[in-house]
């Protein structure tokens, strides 16, 4: 009997070894270990995950396949992960075969408690209905105007005074935390018309904001542990699952009160025949005459919108300001562009008044080089560095890679912006000029499957234009007033999360910007090369010509 058991064990081990050797030959990418698959590599490289994935993709021509656990019957299905950054593969997944690559059950189960069947956590008809409904709102000028009001108010009354105080007291500030607070207030105001006041002197805590942060952190932890484990912890009430449950209760209570109050306000106005403007997203959904939405649906609309709009803009701006501190030439071009626009729109009689009000819509729209610098930041440091899809049915990607049903595909947005085959030999350099047309100085909208920072295809970010509006307004407000330097000894590194936060924040010192010196360097040229007209943006080596005033940045 013992001999039979021993022979059976030898047969199993031999069979597994032969299977493992065969599967190892066709898997490309990181080393795969017996049973453990690529998990040891993931653990070893966890502090530089995105760079590690990028290195593997470069070595494998833009696509590789690996298995998290090298177990028969799983390694080619649930355990198989295809990783790609090939633009043709991305277009295939995100557009051509969109229905074959949904969010999938893993993503939905992880975020269901927080986001329910909201637009960022749903597929199929549920997603399509919400997408169409939201798209109608995002195309309205009203929402853009509302965003502008919230952003400008936050900048003028809170954000800039906090920076000014820090400058006067020679105190460093964590710019990432401060911008995160500002964008949270802005997005909550736009989502449901409430001022959360997290970006205020003293940096006060807000119950809803704290609960939202805890709930997001607990939900993200579910990604890094097996499903059965977090399900068990939830059932037993252990660890962060306890925090998640309590935080969700606080969120539900807060939003229920907001929704109930808004319903009463709208009903009272309807009965009295009065009209008070409510241009937040929640009110616009509630005022639709053709639909009647449940409180749960409205709550999920607000939460999904906040999750999508808060972290992404703040993270992008943090990396933008860090890059600016290391590229003074780019900083100089941005400040000169801002000043050139303000010379035309506000004049030079009272330059000190330039900082009394944030830039308006028309002024922001003319900041072409600033938009290029922000886009270049997003290319190198996308707010969401990796995303994944579930494979519904067997398929073959354009590069010939077979992806079986039940497996998953991770597309690396981080790597997509760092490939020589897509962006050229200087792909790792911070070069805003790659976004500026050398012919007419206009902004170049690169193909969405090469530049995937705002996703692509049917799921492309609805709030892209609002995000640019907010980021450009905040960036212009800071750079017009201050010169930034990173605090000596402060280490800037990536935090391994679904969102590309800075692990230690961004500690900076602030110094007053000398606008008079910059304005003096802007020379009025009335030569044959300058004729009457409108601002023609940034031309060539950072030369911005404003044709109707004859002002050129030199």
UniProtKB/Swiss-Prot annotation:
Residues annotated as binding heme: 461
Cofactor(s) named in the record: heme
Major localization class: membrane
Gene Ontology biological-process entries: fatty acid metabolic process
GO molecular function, one term: oxidoreductase activity, acting on paired donors, with incorporation or reduction of molecular oxygen, reduced flavin or flavoprotein as one donor, and incorporation of one atom of oxygen
Membrane disposition: Single-pass membrane protein
Transmembrane region(s): 6-23
Catalytic function, reaction form: an organic molecule + reduced [NADPH--hemoprotein reductase] + O2 = an alcohol + oxidized [NADPH--hemoprotein reductase] + H2O + H(+)
Keywords, in A-Z order: Heme, Iron, Membrane, Metal-binding, Monooxygenase, Oxidoreductase, Phosphoprotein, Transmembrane, Transmembrane helix
UniProt note on tissues of expression: Expressed in stems, flowers and siliques.
E.C. numbers: 1.14.14.1
Compartments reported by the entry: Membrane
Phosphothreonine: residues bearing it: 549
Pfam families: p450 (PF00067)
Catalytic class of the enzyme: oxidoreductase
Gene induction: By abscisic acid (ABA), auxin, the etylene precursor ACC and cold treatment. Down-regulated by wounding and in etiolated seedlings.
Changes seen on gene knockout: No visible phenotype under normal growth conditions, but mutant plants have reduced content of the flower polyesters 16-hydroxypalmitate, 10,16-dihydroxypalmitate and 1,16-hexadecanedioate.
GO cellular component: membrane
Recorded superkingdom: Eukaryota
Function of the molecule: Catalyzes the omega-hydroxylation of various fatty acids (FA). Acts on saturated and unsaturated fatty acids with chain lengths from C12 to C18. Involved in the biosynthesis of 16-hydroxypalmitate.
Family: Belongs to the cytochrome P450 family.
Protein name: Cytochrome P450 86A4
Organism: Arabidopsis thaliana (Mouse-ear cress)
């Amino acid at each position: 009997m013992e001999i039979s058991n021993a022979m059976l064990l030898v047969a199993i081990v031999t069979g597994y070894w032969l299977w493992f050797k065969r599967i190892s030959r066709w898997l490309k990418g990181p080393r795969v270990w017996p049973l453990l698959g690529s998990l040891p590599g993931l653990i070893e490289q966890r502090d530089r995950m995105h760079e590690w994935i990028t290195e593997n993709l470069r070595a494998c021509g833009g696509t590789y396949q690996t298995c998290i656990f090298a177990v028969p019957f799983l390694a080619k299905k649930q355990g198989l992960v295809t990783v790609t950054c090939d633009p043709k593969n991305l277009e295939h997944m995100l557009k051509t075969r969109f229905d074959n690559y949904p969010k999938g059950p893993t993503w939905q189960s992880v975020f269901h408690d927080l986001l329910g069947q909201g637009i960022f956590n749903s597929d199929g008809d549920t997603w399509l209905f919400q997408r169409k409904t939201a798209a109608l709102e995002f195309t309205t000028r009203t929402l853009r105007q509302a965003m502008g009001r919230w952003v400008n108010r936050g900048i003028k009354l809170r954000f800039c005074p906090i920076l000014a105080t820090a400058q006067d007291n020679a105190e460093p500030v964590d710019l990432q935390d401060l911008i995160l607070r500002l964008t949270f207030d802005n997005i909550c105001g736009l989502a449901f018309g409430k001022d959360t006041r997290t970006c205020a002197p003293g940096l006060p805590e807000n119950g809803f904001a704290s609960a939202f942060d805890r709930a997001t952190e607990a939900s993200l932890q579910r990604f890094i542990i097996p499903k059965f484990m977090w399900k068990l912890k939830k059932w037993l009430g252990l660890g962060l699952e306890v925090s998640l449950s309590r935080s969700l209760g606080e969120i539900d209570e807060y939003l229920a009160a907001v929704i109930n109050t808004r319903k009463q306000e709208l009903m009272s106005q309807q009965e009295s025949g009065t009209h008070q403007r409510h241009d937040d997203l929640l009110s616009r959904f509630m005022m639709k005459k053709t639909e009647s939405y449940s409180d749960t649906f409205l709550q999920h609309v607000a939460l999904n919108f906040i999750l999508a709009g808060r972290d992404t803009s703040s993270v992008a701006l943090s990396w933008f300001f860090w890059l600016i501190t290391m590229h003074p030439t780019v900083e100089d071009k941005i400040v000169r562009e801002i000043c050139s626009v303000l010379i035309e729109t506000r004049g030079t009689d009272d330059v000190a008044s330039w900082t009394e009000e944030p830039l308006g819509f028309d002024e922001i729209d003319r900041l072409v080089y600033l938009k290029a610098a922000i886009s270049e930041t997003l290319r190198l440091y996308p707010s969401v560095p990796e995303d994944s899809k579930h494979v519904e049915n067997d398929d073959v990607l354009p590069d010939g890679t077979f992806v079986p049903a039940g497996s998953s595909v991770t597309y690396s947005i981080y790597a997509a912006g760092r490939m020589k085959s897509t962006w050229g030999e200087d792909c790792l350099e911070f070069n805003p000029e790659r976004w500026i047309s050398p012919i007419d100085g206009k902004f170049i909208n690169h193909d969405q499957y090469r530049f995937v920072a705002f996703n692509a295809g049917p799921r492309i970010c609805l709030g892209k234009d609002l995000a640019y509006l907010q980021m450009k307004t905040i960036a212009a407000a800071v750079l017009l007033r201050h010169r930034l330097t990173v605090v000596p000894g402060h280490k800037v590194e990536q935090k391994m999360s679904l969102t590309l936060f800075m692990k230690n924040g961004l500690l900076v010192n602030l110094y007053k910007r000398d606008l008079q010196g910059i304005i003096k360097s802007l020379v009025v040229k009335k030569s044959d090369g300058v004729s009457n007209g409108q601002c023609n943006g940034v031309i060539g080596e950072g030369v911005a010509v404003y044709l109707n005033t004859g002002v050129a940045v030199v």
